[in-house]
Amino acid sequence: MFKKLINKKNTINNYNEELDSSNIPEHIAIIMDGNGRWAKKRKMPRIKGHYEGMQTIKKITRVASDIGVKYLTLYAFSTENWSRPESEVNYIMNLPVNFLKTFLPELIEKNVKVETIGFTDKLPKSTIEAINNAKEKTANNTGLKLIFAINYGGRAELVHSIKNMFDELHQQGLNSDIIDETYINNHLMTKDYPDPELLIRTSGEQRISNFLIWQVSYSEFIFNQKLWPDFDEDELIKCIKIYQSRQRRFGGLSEE
């Protein structure tokens, strides 16, 4: 046990030596793509890919916490994913129950706070209960915020937010002059989080698939070739190193 702890500490130290500690992205968002293809390549059922993808979430959460990332948002289930086969959807809906049952003690120990964005009231009762239990048990934690985007879609979020803004303006007798970027930000599901500096998508696909479409306007995009179950700690560190090699310009010019 002691040797295992020493090895873990050495690994964390190695990661920290590879990275510029002053330029760790505060918020990383990940589109976890490739579970089904991972399983298909191995002639396994798609649900096996989702199971292995759950193990990857554990690995990435640990290392993100260890290197000082403050927010990690994972695209777990989109509003469009309901169109998948019923058996697959049912399995995915049960994943948070199993994941949080096995991983929650470690999340508590590592001071990780579990949060969600999305229309979670539409999820099965058992899924909602597991999520709410994790939120309650980690509510006072002050470390990494692990944010699951579940039953989430960027366009649906914007429609929902616009309706709320319209109702608020109407009820308070205000006009549209009050609306600016800050006002919109304050009505999004992500209002308590900074925009992601880094968006990673695994599997080699190069699109954002309706994920955080307002929030990633100035994010750095990295499209990693690994399928999500094969994406590991070293791959995350590689992505962060690529991020650190870039200069974020926010529409301006780079320094010469």
UniProtKB/Swiss-Prot annotation:
Annotated cofactor note: Binds 2 magnesium ions per subunit.
GO molecular function annotation: ditrans,polycis-undecaprenyl-diphosphate synthase [(2E,6E)-farnesyl-diphosphate specific] activity; magnesium ion binding; manganese ion binding
Protein keywords: Magnesium, Metal-binding, Transferase
Binding positions for Mg(2+) per the UniProt entry: 33, 220
Disulfide bridge partners, by residue number: none
Catalytic residue list: 33, 81
Cofactors demanded by this protein: Mg(2+)
Pfam family, one: Prenyltransf
Subunit structure: Homodimer.
Purpose of the protein: Catalyzes the condensation of isopentenyl diphosphate (IPP) with allylic pyrophosphates generating different type of terpenoids.
Family the UniProt entry places it in: Belongs to the UPP synthase family.
Name recorded for this polypeptide: Isoprenyl transferase
